Amino acid sequence: ALDKFREFHDTAACGSGSIFQSMNSTVTMNLACLFRLRGINLTASAACASGSQSVGLAYLLVRDGLQDCVVCGGAQENNMYSVAAFDGIQSFSVREDEPTRASRPFDRDRDGLVPGGGAATLIVEDYDSAVRRGAPILAEIVGWGFSGNGDHISTPNVEGPARSLELCLEHAGVTPAEIGYVNAHATSTRIGNAREAQAIARFFG
């Protein structure tokens, strides 16, 4: 659209749909139209944490009585442009001869992540709502924590993830000893894994 604008010097050349192709909220707006959803509609944009943040926000909306039910999730599309731009920060593994062993989170020989795409969707809802519609209840969300680094946009520190863990445990009312599984970010990058491991060790030893 911008190329056409530069060529013709006329905004009409952009087309009436170009603005919607540039907004990340278009995804959730389209889904709401497809499924006739009338509730709160927003797109969480928080880099790798976007999907987790959407689940956390859904939990808060249901917990506080603003929604009975929320469709939430996350998606990552892989294409030449997104991968090329991401590779600019030199975070990808260079083990191209070992693609199945290239991703080595928390390994001393790690050298970066392996790009991938995918999507997942969850229905987060009030217990009474789930029972009423006969939904299979797979899990209960009891707490959530979210915190940013606050000092660098791409280089993580220890305090950001540690604060997230602290808030999650505090809001859930559970102790580290009661946790049986931690789903780490685990980028396999030198600095990222080291800082994340320090944050996890602060609470789980």
Where are these regions (language model features)?
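Conserved catalytic cysteine-centered active-site region
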Residues: 1-57, 89-114, 197-205
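Residues on a specific face of well-ordered alpha-helices
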Residues: 25-29, 33, 56, 60, ...
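Conserved small-residue
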Residues: 31, 51, 58, 86, ...
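Short acidic/polar capping segments at secondary-structure boundaries
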Residues: 37, 47-50, 75-78, 128-129, ...
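Beta-strand segments within the central parallel beta-sheet cores of soluble alpha/beta enzyme folds
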Residues: 41-46, 67-75, 136-144, 177-184
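Short loop segments at secondary-structure junctions
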Residues: 65, 125-129, 204
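Acyl-CoA/ACP chain-elongation machinery
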Residues: 66-111, 144-158, 184-194
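Condensing-enzyme catalytic core mediating Claisen C-C bond formation in acyl metabolism
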Residues: 97-174, 180-181
